[in-house]
């Protein structure tokens, strides 16, 4: 915990003094089709494979992209909670974040153009305990973590997005 707090303080101090260093391009994620609806997503770390359910033509051999979205939110929120607890000097004894969503697949399949393709709703459940913290302290940690979670921010804020098409 102390090493996390020290690293956060060092990075925060540096970016306070050098705000021009705070903006950078994120690593590229590239999805390459393997077969059918199965894709290998490549980046700077281990590749990830996705697939779709058999009901829509996939082989159900790997997580769906929608599940990876929920996994990204769960991992990001959990990471930020751990960082905020470390910043406060609170040793967590348990931290678990689960993310559920509801979707209407008419949107993905184009059956009804009025139905959104993305989740209709998302529920985040956080189980958090610490021997040396009150419930109010833990709630404050979660509130700060949620306000600083990049994945959560990308989901709730309208982020400018462009698409470039190459057909060669």
What are these regions (language model features)?
Residues 1-71, 81-168:
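Extended beta-strand/beta-hairpin segments
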